[in-house]
Amino acid sequence: MIKYLGVVSLVALSLSATADEGPLGSVLMKQTNGCMEGPIEQFGRYIGDWTITDQRLQQDGVTWSPGNGARWNFTCVGDGIAVQDFWMPNGPDGGPPPGVGTNLRIYDPATKRWEVTWTATNAPGMTHIRAEQNDKGDILMHWVTPEQNPPRRITFFAPTADGWDWTMEMSFDGGENWTEVYKIKAAPRK
């Protein structure tokens, strides 16, 4: 028993020494290989630093108006444990940003879908979202809690060499039909 405890202690000491060797970022956020393979790659392919141009549908239901844009940074957590992103919108007319937000995206192999937690400056707690990749390679996200009224969903379209697109839709008839209300175009930051 004493010999066993000695071996366990040595292993624990060597593990803690390894984790303590570098800055926290290099231990948790620098390795991306685990986010670029298997199902984690579904969101891993968005890892990078993106410049966002956005548009909102106006009340008339026809006219689109440009937004203030944003910066959106996706990173790999723990070499494949999760994908985390940081949403940093631009302020109006070059002013200070209104706040920031973050998603933590974790793949559940048992259900073959993503469990996503979103929170932001001035948000009332957290939002739980579920996501699943469709046959076209797009990722469709639905709110779980808090319940949204009207219902909404988000689609991440498969990325290309030039970036990727994203849309938010709302349903005004209980989910029968969906209307795009917000669109994003992401391009690599230069």
Model-derived features: positions:
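Conserved Ser/Thr-centered positions that define the repeating blades of beta-propeller domains
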Residues: 169-171
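Helix-adjacent hinge/juxtasegments
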Residues: 90-125
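N-terminal glycine/threonine-rich, aromatic-flanked beta-hairpin/loop signature
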Residues: 65-100
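Bacterial N-terminal signal peptides
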Residues: 6-14
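Short, surface-exposed coil-to-beta transition loops
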Residues: 67-71, 97-102, 124-128, 149-154, ...
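Tryptophan-centered short beta-strand motifs
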Residues: 61-66, 95-97, 114, 175-180
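Amphipathic/hydrophobic helical signal segments and adjacent flexible N-terminal regions
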Residues: 2-4, 16-64, 189-190
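Short, hydrophobic/aromatic-rich segments at coil-to-beta transitions
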Residues: 47-51, 79-85, 111-116, 134-142, ...
